[in-house]
């Protein structure tokens, strides 16, 4: 992560392709980014991402959140937000710990390593050139699906779980 800061990750065009985009309730936004976005800049600097908040974007008053930056950093931010908003108490605690961590100090390389957890709500399995993702029906936040194809990473955003058939 320190290499990204020294080299200026914002100078790499690939980090701006396929941004992570999702809608968030106002109370979750205030909890994560602070009142009047007090923690927004700190979260951006510590995660090497750029986060754009568009308030009242949806008819229901939700905020549209767009995150760009290195893929692993975007996935970490997504995981933190998903866990903070989870109905599962253990995931909520993990999410709150991640939130406190990112407010306190920059992410390290070991923070960005993917560790499949037993009972995790996101399972990724690779078979041949296809990646399958299984998502539980109780997820509250949108999911971004990433897969590697011929050396290129492609991101798919699912913005509304209600559109999916379980």
From Swiss-Prot:
Domain of life of the organism in this record?
Eukaryota
Keywords assigned: RNA-binding
InterPro entries linked to this entry: KH_dom_type_1_sf, MOEP19_KH-like
**Any GO molecular function:** RNA binding
Instruction: Identify the residues that the record assigns to the KH domain, covering every copy.
Output: 19-78
Query: Is RNA-binding a UniProt keyword of this protein?
Result: yes
> Belongs to which family?
Belongs to the KHDC1 family.
* Annotated protein name in UniProt: KH homology domain-containing protein 1C
Can you name the source organism? Mus musculus (Mouse)
Give the classification, highest ranks.
Answer: Eukaryota, Metazoa, Chordata, Craniata, Vertebrata
Primary gene name = Khdc1c
